[in-house]
């Protein structure tokens, strides 16, 4: 990039990643989230055709996470963006296609919706007694729980739902799929 073009691009990218006010600060004085945003801006400076991002929203507060996630979606229109992350919501909102790797091996590759559909009928919700919670946490993949009066509603990701409880089939999410694939053997 030529100097003038680089200056303009830097100004634009700093505004995009919400670092305009910190433009003259040393990088060492930045918080973790600020450093993350600065690295994303730096990676985009030469307008690469392929962009590889590792945990791009790690350490960001929810407002900044959404802003960066939306920004990544925008730039993905005209470039290939590969994201490695454990932040499932980032993938749900950004990705057209998802590649799941486990121990370096390809587990699955498809659209978010098709992957989630693979575990249809494997996600259930049910009410349990408070005393039963530890049993379910020790023996099932519990993806969520909340208190409902004197009971607890648990969301399980399982091939074998308990037979002695009234269960409701729930719509699976990408987070449920993550638990199903990466927490097998629980």
Q: Each predicted region: which residue ranges?
A:
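ABC transporter nucleotide-binding domain
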Residues: 70-156
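Short loop immediately C-terminal to the Walker-B catalytic DE motif
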Residues: 57-58, 88
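Catalytic Walker B motif of ABC-type/P-loop ATPase nucleotide-binding domains
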Residues: 51-54
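Hydrophobic anchor residue at the start of the ABC signature
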Residues: 40
């Amino acid at each position: 990039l030529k100097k003038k073009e680089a200056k303009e691009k830097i100004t634009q990218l700093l505004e995009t990643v919400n670092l305009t006010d910190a433009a003259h600060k040393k990088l060492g004085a930045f918080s973790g989230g600020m450093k993350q945003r600065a690295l994303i801006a730096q990676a985009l400076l030469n307008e690469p055709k392929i962009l590889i991002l590792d945990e791009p929203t790690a350490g960001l507060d929810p407002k900044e996470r959404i802003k960066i996630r939306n920004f990544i979606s925008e730039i993905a229109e005209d470039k290939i963006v590969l994201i490695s992350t454990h932040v499932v919501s980032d993938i749900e909102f950004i990705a057209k296609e998802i590649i799941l790797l486990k121990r370096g091996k390809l587990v699955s590759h498809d659209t978010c919706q098709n992957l989630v559909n693979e575990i249809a009928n494997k996600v259930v919700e049910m009410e349990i007694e408070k005393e039963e919670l530890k049993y379910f946490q020790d023996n099932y993949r519990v993806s969520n729980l909340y208190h409902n009066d004197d009971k607890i509603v648990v969301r399980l990701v399982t091939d074998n739902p308990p037979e002695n409880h009234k269960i409701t089939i729930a719509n699976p999410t990408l987070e449920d799929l993550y638990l199903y694939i990466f927490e097998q053997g629980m």
